[in-house]
């Protein structure tokens, strides 16, 4: 972990994938953007652009577990996405429990002045990505 400086976090979803950036030195994560996905498949050129721009030392992918800690229906898809990130970009990829991050992200959006329109038009996925990456930083650094 000593050689980790910058991380990208991904909140995987079948229609949208939230992205966040975090720094180990500050222990802080912030939202970056939301990528569109088609049945869980992102535009890999957009992902490649983010990797090239930010040059992360590692990637963290949210693992959607059930409340009792067991894998959810989406867990296997998120793990497959994590493996694809590793295979395409040859970076270490970690998974992190993302339970309740979307719920928390909606609360944070409301605290920032409320939701404008639908969550489809104004998603909270990047906020959720920042929350899961922040959780990983707190647990692992």
Curated annotation (Swiss-Prot):
Pfam families documented for this protein: RuvX (PF03652)
Cellular component GO terms, alphabetical: cytosol
Keywords: Cytoplasm, Hydrolase, Nuclease, Ribosome biogenesis
GO biological process: rRNA 5'-end processing
GO molecular function, one term: nuclease activity
SUPFAM superfamilies from the UniProt entry: Ribonuclease H-like
E.C. code: 3.1.-.-
Domain of life: Bacteria
Class of enzymatic activity (EC top level): hydrolase
Gene3D superfamilies named in the record: YqgF/RNase H-like domain
InterPro entries membership: RNaseH-like_sf, YqgF, YqgF/RNaseH-like_dom, YqgF/RNaseH-like_dom_sf
Location relative to the cell: Cytoplasm
Task of the protein: Could be a nuclease involved in processing of the 5'-end of pre-16S rRNA.
Family membership: Belongs to the YqgF nuclease family.
Protein name (database record): Putative pre-16S rRNA nuclease
């Amino acid at each position: 972990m000593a050689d980790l400086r910058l991380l990208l976090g991904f909140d995987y979803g079948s229609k949208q994938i939230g992205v966040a950036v975090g720094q180990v030195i500050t222990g802080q994560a912030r939202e970056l953007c939301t990528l569109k996905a088609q049945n869980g498949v992102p535009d890999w050129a957009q992902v490649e652009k983010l990797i090239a721009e930010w040059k992360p030392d590692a990637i963290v992918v949210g693992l959607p577990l059930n409340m009792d800690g067991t894998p959810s229906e989406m867990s296997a898809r998120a793990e497959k996405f994590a493996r694809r990130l590793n295979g395409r970009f040859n970076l270490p990829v970690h998974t992190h429990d993302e339970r309740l991050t979307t719920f928390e992200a909606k609360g944070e959006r409301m605290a920032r002045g409320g939701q404008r329109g639908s969550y489809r038009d104004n998603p909270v996925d990047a906020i959720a990505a920042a929350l899961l990456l922040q959780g990983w930083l707190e647990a692992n650094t």
